[in-house]
Swiss-Prot record:
Protein name: Urease subunit alpha
GO molecular function annotation: nickel cation binding; urease activity
Biological classification of the source: Bacteria, Pseudomonadati, Pseudomonadota, Gammaproteobacteria, Cellvibrionales
Note accompanying the cofactor annotation: Binds 2 nickel ions per subunit.
Species assigned in the record: Saccharophagus degradans (strain 2-40 / ATCC 43961 / DSM 17024)
Top EC class, one word: hydrolase
Gene designation: ureC
Length: 568
């Protein structure tokens, strides 16, 4: 039997079982757990390669073959780290397994035919597109920025650079919701809009959900009182939608205990649960210990560095319409930025007590940095805390990698009722797929696939004789244009909105998908991130303890996935 060295094999077909891959320039390594391909029967496209007529390509017609196959990719998802061929059919993931020609090859589960396109995944990491569940829709250019970073679903609220949107993630009222749904059809991005949830009576909230909101947002700038919390959650229970909350920093209408009591055990997504982005000072972080609370972070505090505190004070003054000449406004800002709780947030992510990471786009957050800041946090925690218990003795960081990737894929999908469509690499889901060269993992995708069509990619000079000459930068591809754009992305709304035929009312062309199971999801469902510690915060020193353990760490002075990759 002929043999090939591991190095030569990896260079040709990508890593296989037992091989380790470094994630960008971090201290994180993942190890291949399983290989669905068959040694000696791998398929690869190119001159003199396997996928040719009568060889790796069969005569099967399109009813038996996928539209696209991604060959020999290393899948990194919450459920595993495996090598496989991935098939896409009608915009969805149709199979994960072994591609080829069953007429001459054994073990084929994905038949390649003359109607099949090929994307080379050899040596690349394949992940699900990120879900950013904390978006201020301040400008449409955010969507392109997010897409080019690897985000394929954006959930939040807003109407553009209105003063309300600059501070809060709410799209208030039927007219605004309709306009945002109409505008959204121009983008290769799944979108969902949160209505304004701040009201003590249900009428206005019912209207917004029936008009196309996928959920509701409670924000302190609109008055997040116990009465509005209770009413909003009551409405959400009736419509099976999620509620996101930014709690009362000033403790004007109650303390964190009053807010938790107002939840009455009902599920809620707490934004920036550490508190720098807003929330009961100094102890909103306690909320992560509740079984009905789905806690997330926003990315400016990820991870804790020597620059974090200084940067936040300036951001806060702008985003919340504060005046540095008014002492009360300055005191408000100072109360929200606490190095002790930000440091604890790092550790709570590593323990799996904080379940999600999002951006808070242009409103104390960077829309294109959800992914890289998640992995920077994972790196910092490995350097400072060592291997997780689940990774001890394995020589790799597989469990930590699964924990962190879940924070921006499957967990926000579960939290907002969209996991039946997006959030993981699983058969039947939308083919929202990101490919990464390992050296650029989490920083610069090599290909962004949206609903089965290539929507964006780094591309060279269009007038060059080959695709690679400079200037190479991210450009929209065919999947981001025309009807293809509308047919490869979806808008998430409530079931009540679909029942009300808003597609006809607003003359929408792209598919509307109802969110579901929003009210039954709990912290226990947060994949690899379900820890519910007993939380304590010292009101004077701001020291944070989880199950009696003091949570503290030093700020990072240097991070990976940073200036090495970016000129600006």
């Amino acid at each position: 039997m002929s043999k090939i060295s591991r190095r030569a094999y990896a260079d040709m077909y990508g890593p296989t079982v037992g091989d380790k891959v470094r994630l960008a320039d971090t201290a994180l390594w993942i190890q291949v757990e399983k290989d669905f391909t068959i040694y000696g029967e791998e398929v690869k496209f190119g001159g003199g390669k396997v996928i040719r007529d009568g060889m790796g390509q069969s005569q099967a017609t399109s009813d038996k073959t996928p539209d696209t196959v991604i060959t020999n990719a290393l899948i990194l998802d919450h459920w595993g780290i495996v090598k496989a061929d991935v098939a896409i059919k009608n915009g969805r993931i149709s199979a994960i397994g072994k591609a080829g020609n069953p007429d001459i090859q054994p073990g084929v589960t994905i038949i390649v035919g003359p109607c099949t396109e090929v994307i080379a995944g050899e040596g690349q990491i394949l992940t699900a597109g990120a879900i950013d569940s904390h978006i201020h829709f301040i400008c449409p250019q955010q969507i392109d920025e997010a897409l080019m970073s690897g985000t394929t679903t954006m959930i939040g609220g807003g109407t553009g650079p209105a003063t309300g949107t600059n501070a809060t993630t709410c799209t208030p009222g039927k007219w605004h919701i309709g306009k945002m749904l109409q505008a959204g059809e121009s983008f290769a991005m799944n979108l969902g809009f949160l209505g304004k949830g701040n009201a003590s009576l249900p009428g206005g909230l019912n209207e917004q959900l029936e008009a196309g909101a996928l959920g509701l947002k409670l924000h302190e700038d609109w008055g997040t009182t116990p009465a509005s919390i209770d009413n909003c959650l009551t409405v959400a229970e009736n419509y099976d939608v999620q509620v996101a909350i930014h709690t009362d920093t000033l403790n004007e209408s109650g303390f964190v205990e009053d807010t938790l009591a107002a939840f009455k055990g009902r599920t809620i997504h707490t934004y920036h649960t550490e508190g720098a982005g807003g929330g009961h000072a100094p102890d909103i972080i306690k909320a992560c210990g509740s079984s009905n609370v789905l806690p997330s972070s926003t990315n400016p505090t990820r991870p804790y560095t020597v620059n974090t505190v200084d940067e936040h004070l300036d951001m806060l003054m702008v985003c919340h319409h504060l005046d540095p000449n008014i002492p009360e406004d300055v005191a408000f800002a100072d109360s929200r930025i606490r190095k002790e709780t930000i440091a604890a947030e790092d550790i709570l992510h590593d323990l799996g007590a904080f379940s999600m990471i999002a951006s808070d786009s242009q409103a104390m957050g960077r829309v294109g940095e959800v992914i890289c800041r998640t992995w920077q946090t994972a790196h910092k925690m490995k350097v400072q805390r060592g291997l997780l218990p689940e990774d001890e003795g394995t020589g790799a960081d597989n469990f930590r990698a699964k924990r962190y990737i879940a924070k921006y894929t499957i967990n926000p999908a579960l939290a907002h009722g969209v996991a039946h469509e997006v959030g993981s690499i699983e058969v039947g889901k939308l083919a929202d797929i990101i490919l990464w060269k390992p050296a650029f993992f989490g920083v610069k995708p090599s290909l962004i696939i949206k609903g089965g069509a290539i929507a964006a990619a780094p591309m060279g000079d269009p007038n060059a004789s080959i695709p690679t000459p400079q200037p190479v930068h991210y450009r929209k591809m065919f999947g981001a244009y025309g009807q293809a754009c509308k047919q490869t992305s979806v808008s998430f709304v409530s079931q009540a909105a679909i029942d009300a035929s808003i597609s006809d009312y607003f003359q929408l062309e792209r598919r509307l998908v109802a969110v579901k199971n929003c009210r039954s999801v709990t912290k226990a469902d947060m994949v690899h991130n379900a820890y519910q510690p007993h939380m304590e915060v010292d009101p004077e020193t701001y020291e944070v303890r989880a199950d009696g353990q003091l949570l503290t760490c030093e700020p990072a002075e240097e991070l990976p996935m940073a200036q090495r990759y970016f000129l600006f």
